Amino acid sequence: MKNGYYQTKIRGIYKYISDNLYLNRPDVEIKGEHFNSTLLFSLLTGINRGKELIIGEPGLGKTTSAEYVGSILYRYPLGVIWGSEVSGHPEQTEEKIIGRPHLGELNKGKERVVWSNFAQIPVKIVDEINRLPETKQSMILNGVDRGNWEYLNEILINDEYSLFATANYQDRGTNTIIAPLIDRFDVLIESRHPGSNIAYIIGKEASSNHPLRHPQYEKELHQILRGDKPYEEKMTLAEGVCNLFGDYLKEHLGLEGLNKDERNNVNEEMVEIDFDLDTNAFVRMALAELSFCHKYGQKRSVEVCEEGCHYTGYLCHHIKNCASNRLPISIRNYAQALAWFLEDDGVDIEHVRLIIPHVLAHRIQWKDSYLSKKEGEGRNDPFQIYLAKEATEEIFQRYNEQREYLLDALSVGYRAFAGEEVTPLEGDHPIYEEIKKDIGVKDEKPL
């Protein structure tokens, strides 16, 4: 169903949360519209089944914003969301996160797993993930990446899920999020202070009666999740209760979330949205700067690009690691989700310019020399997001300068790849060397 039917529902969720639950200032603009980035990206995460890392100071709504989006979008009462969250702390165990043995069956000499609510429901929230010790972060790698949860000799596979994790800024109680885990997050967002005037209103209107609670449906869902039925059957029963809660939200709050079929329909609509020619070329140029190394063949975190390289003026000289293959997937999924949300016919450069800094900020490892050079600059964003925004605009400027020539070079590359005898175009950017590699032409530039 097109013509804005689902988008109207999602915009209704955004407006209700923004007006009533997560009071905020808009901090991003696209296509003449203003949005709060935390709320916008949380909704995009929910509809495209993504993974979002929300950073910020304590008490600024990192966890609550994700709870509200997950509750309304997936139509789970807030009490179930609360009861399914995982808290990050040093004593956290696999049994609390994923599942535990069924003690009754264990006494009979049988193995059976009692899965946690976190592993079962599609809305997954990890609060203060950077308080998990690095050794315990590995426990959730496969679950975070693929929705596969393993315990004893059993496996539970989620057919749909969205992950929201929060992290405070570094202090004595936090740990570094390991590289394999941080790379699995699609986007990094900051939950910002709303300003003194809005903060005063929040304090004035705080209430213990939450409109997203429903004790009866919460009890029914907890009973289903604790039951002995097969996982697929439990999810079917849970969806029935969620539909009842959805009816309640519509009747009492005028809110419409999405049932499972509708969420599937939205995903089908999003994947049909194509990138236009300019956006395709711009993303390729960005990926080239984030993975190319003239001296060593590609970026590697264990190899240092020295001064004097021919490509000193590009991002590849300022970073230590190579962009993973998850990066273009994140760009595509979130750019399509944003274009769908705005009801645009295709993904254009304006969409990806908004998306790229947030899919890049947590993945890129900058050289210390570059960090020292930039850290004193004034900014409105946390340092890592600021650097990613600056990098995106640098690439965009280079793209505008070379647009026509780059499009010609890509066209020649396509023809060569198809078997035509052509000479690849020369250019002073890593993307031209990548085109040569793709068609088997040796790079002649000096190391």
Question: What are the roles of these predicted feature ranges?
Answer:
Residues 53, 58-67, 292-447:
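C-terminal engagement/docking regions of AAA+ P-loop ATPases
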